[in-house]
C-alpha cells in the first residue's frame, strides 16, 4: 500500500488508513511533539498500513510514546493490541469503561461480532493489551506532550467510553460529532445500536462551548471548527425528529432512511459512495436512533 502522509501543521500529521483498500474512511493522526502520540489505530486488518504510515513520518515504531484512541470500536482501536506489540515503548490511554475490555477481549470481540456480523471479521480480531501498558483517562485527565498537553473530554452518546481529545486549540473528535464528508461539505450522525441521544447532544454542547480551531475527524479528515458544533447539534436533532415521525407512521428503518435521503442533501450520494465497511452505516444510524426512542418509551 502506498500511504500518503499529510501535514496539518508542525505537530499534527495524518493519513488515510485505507483498510481493505477502502479510502476516505479512516483517518489516522500522528502528534509529533517532544512525545509522539498515535491517535486511533484503525482495525486489525490494516496493521501493515498503520506501520507504513508511521514510518512515512520518519518515525520508528520505538518512537511512539502514546497510543490514544477516542473509543474502542473496532474501526478505531481494533488494531490497538497489534500495534502495541511492535511499539514496545508505548502506553495506551483509554476511558475507564474501556480498560477491562481491552485487557480481556472476549466480551469486546463477541459484542462486536454480535453487532457488526461479517464486518467484524473483515476488521479482524483484536489482541489483548496488558494492564501494565494501559492508562485510565478520567474526565479532565491531562498529559504533557511537550509544546502542548492533551486532555480528555468525556463525550458519551455514540459510546459510553468515548473521549474527545483536546490538543492545544484543536480536538480529535472520533465519532462524537458524526461523520464528515469534505467533498459534500456536510456531516451526518453516526449511531451504533446502543446509542444515547440525550448524552450525544450533551457532549456536542460541551464541545460547542470550547471554541476549537480545528476538528480532527476519524471519519474523515481535518475540518475548521467555526460553527460546526451548532450545525452538528441541529443535524442530530433533525434526524431524530424525522426518525420519530417515521416511527409514528409505523415505517420501517429502511423507509425512514428513504425519507432522510429525500430531505438531506448529499446523504444519498454519501451512501452510494460507501465501501464494504460502511455499506449500512446510515441505515445503522436510523436503527440506533429507533432503539433509543424505544428504550425511552419503555421507561414511561
Describe each model-derived feature in a short phrase.
Residues 2-57, 165-175:
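Conserved beta-strand hairpin/beta-sheet module of binuclear metal-dependent hydrolase folds
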Residues 77-87, 104-105:
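Metal-dependent catalytic neighborhoods of phosphoester/phosphodiester hydrolases
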Residues 245-300:
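C-terminal regulatory/interaction regions
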Residues 11, 31, 40, 71, ...:
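Divalent metal-coordination and catalytic microenvironments
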Residues 43-45, 63-75, 102-154, 160-226:
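Metallo-beta-lactamase
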Residues 224-241:
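Short, electropositive alpha-helical surface patch
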